[in-house]
Structures are given as structure tokens and as C-alpha cells.
Amino acid sequence: MNEAVIDPILETAVNTGDMFCSQTIPNRCLKDTILIEVQPECADTLQCVLDDKVSRHQPLLLRNHKKLELPSEKSVTRGGFYMQQLELLVKSAPPNEYALLLIQCKDTALADEDNFFVANGVIDAGYRGVISALLYYRPGVTVILPGHLTIYLFPVKLRQSRLLPKNVLKHLDPIFKSIQVQPLSNSPSNYEKPVIPEFADISTVQQGQPLHRDSAEYHIDVPLTYKHIINPKRQEDAGYDICVPYNLYLKRNEFIKIVLPIIRDWDLQHPSINAYIFGRSSKSRSGIIVCPTAWPAGEHCKFYVYNLTGDDIRIKTGDRLAQVLLIDHNTQIHLKHNVLSNIAFPYAIRGKCGIPGVQWYFTKTLDLIATPSERGTRGFGSTDKETNDVDFLLKH
């Protein structure tokens, strides 16, 4: 069972004002241990506990115990939703071989949970700032009752793979054909277009130059102008960034499927790896939602994107749109490991999870005892601040 540890030495150091050093924590406590610091003001708004509905390997659960009035002065419009960034008043420091998934946790008995959603988030081991969640909710929502907003901090054990991507550009000569298909039955209700493009080479589409066409699909030649689709990562980063190899155009409220010309190769050294694609925090905050999904071995990199910015946009060639996490197959997350998902805000059912056997270590001095990191407190798109990769083509 996961064990929540509060070291009495840490409490004494904080209460007396004594200097504290990392040597206070024995080395044996640092392996498979996630440091957590709960801010004092958290008690006023959130309950922060280990989930007692899980018998072993418990995730950290955060739940509002006060009514949340909406929309607040911090809310902004995102397509047909409001969006608000919520500080969860918690800091974390996992080992480099772990990451935390931030996931909404639902109890099926609470019907109003279908009116507000939490964007899936990935917390890197190197992030030392206060963790925030992105809350999306429908315009008719004016209040979230106590206990109705529940969020998991869900640890996952990362794996390394020296054979992560197999670039197939040379096999495509170097043109890759996209396929447009009829929208799925569970596409968003406000979906306007008759087809879902996998590539968005809008100029080619508008010129009407399909190579093959029948009642269901047609193919378009898309020239690739950028070859570095998968970026390398720092040791403390959770995922490998996925870049778009062409200018990607999305109309407001458009819901598209993207297929990239790169295959996840089988890794004979580490066959017990599951790969999952998640969005990046900077894009989720701006309203560009990457639907979290699995990336099965032997298949092209595929995922859905939902434009909730409220504008027509262009994502530039080479922009980091998503990220892929390589997760130990023994970690059972809220996504199926072999299914392409088109759900914008997937959630976990409370009590049904399979996280690795980690120890939560609660402290009031995380900044003093945590391993130094390159990223520090910079979060929510800090690595994108020097670039403007998204053009808003039409203002409303």
C-alpha cells in the first residue's frame, strides 16, 4: 500500500526556523518516492488526501470542499466553453523516472459532472511550481457544488526506448497521402464540416485536387517541409515533443484527426512499454485540445485535435503540438493502450486505477530537499514563451 509519510524532523525544522538540508532524508526514502508540499491556504478550498477507495497504490486526490462560483473574473471564453486556470496549491517532486498525470476523477452518481471538464495534464519531474488545472465548463454552469470537482494526481513510471520512432519519410518518397473520412457519430455536436481532415493542407483542399474519391473518402498529396517530428527530451521531462511537419490550419470549433508520417517501432529491448500521446499545457490553455490517446507499436502517430480558441488558427511548421509518454505496461491509466481515442477530456473512474507502487512523502520544505531541476517553477508553456507558433487568422 502507498504510504503517506510526514517526517517529524521536517515539522521541527519548519516550526523552529532551523536550517534544513537534504541529508535529513535517508537515501532509502528517495527511491520511488514522490515529494509533496501542500500550501497552507489549500485547506481553505481543497481537500488533499490519498484516495481511500483504492486498496493499494493510491493516487493523490484533490476535491473542492467549498462551492465554486462560476464564471469567475479569471474565466476566459474558449470556443463554446469558458476556461479557468485553477491553482491546486500543491507542489511535487517525483524522481526523474516518474511523471504525474493530472486527470479529472468522476463518480458516476454525480450527473452535473458532464457540464464541466478538466484538461488532462502532464507534470514533469522537473517542475517545482504550484500545480494548476485547466477547468473547461459550459456557459450555463454557474456553480460547482462542494465535492463535485475531484482531480487525481496519478503517478506513472516512465520507460526509456532507444527505438522510439521509425521515420518513414523515405518510404513515402517523400509525399504522404492523407485521408479524409466522414465524422464519427460521437463528434462534437457543433461540428460544422462534412469531413474530418487528417492533414490540413487547406490550399490543396480548396483547389479541389483529390487523387481518389468515392462517397466516403479521398486522398490528398501533402508535401512535408519539416523532418524533425519527434524532439529529444531532458531527463527530467516526461514526454518527447511531437512537432507538426507542415502548416496546420484549423477553423474555429474544428475537430480534426492528424496522421504523421512516423511509425512507432517495436522495441525488442523493452517490449513492455505503452506509448500515449497528450497535449501540451500551453496549447491546452489557449484552447487547442489534443485528445489523449494511445500510440500502439507498429502504427503511425495519430491523434485528434479540437480547436476551441474561438478563432481560425494556423499552427506553424515545426511547432510542438503534443507529446508522447513511454509508460511501463504495468501502469494502468485511464486510457486503453491500443485504442485511438477522440475524447477531448477523458477522465478516470474513482477507485479504478493501477498506479506503480510509490511512496508519497509530505513535507513543508520541498524546495530545500528536492533534487535541483532545470525547469524550476516555470510552467504552462514556459518553453514556448519566446516563440509565437500559433497565428490567429480571424478575430471575432
Swiss-Prot record:
The keyword Kinase does not apply. Substrate binds at residues 280-282, 380-381. GO terms for biological process: dUTP metabolic process. Keywords: Hydrolase, Magnesium, Metal-binding, Nucleotide metabolism. It catalyses: dUTP + H2O = dUMP + diphosphate + H(+). Transmembrane segments: none annotated. Its EC number is 3.6.1.23. InterPro entries: dUTPase-like, dUTPase-like_sf, HSV_DUT. It is an enzyme of class 3 (hydrolase). GO terms for molecular function: dUTP diphosphatase activity; metal ion binding. It comes from the Viruses. Its cofactor is Mg(2+). Belongs to the dUTPase family. Involved in nucleotide metabolism: produces dUMP, the immediate precursor of thymidine nucleotides and decreases the intracellular concentration of dUTP to avoid uracil incorporation into viral DNA. This is Deoxyuridine 5'-triphosphate nucleotidohydrolase. It comes from Varicella-zoster virus (strain Dumas) (HHV-3). The lineage of its organism: Viruses, Duplodnaviria, Heunggongvirae, Peploviricota, Herviviricetes.
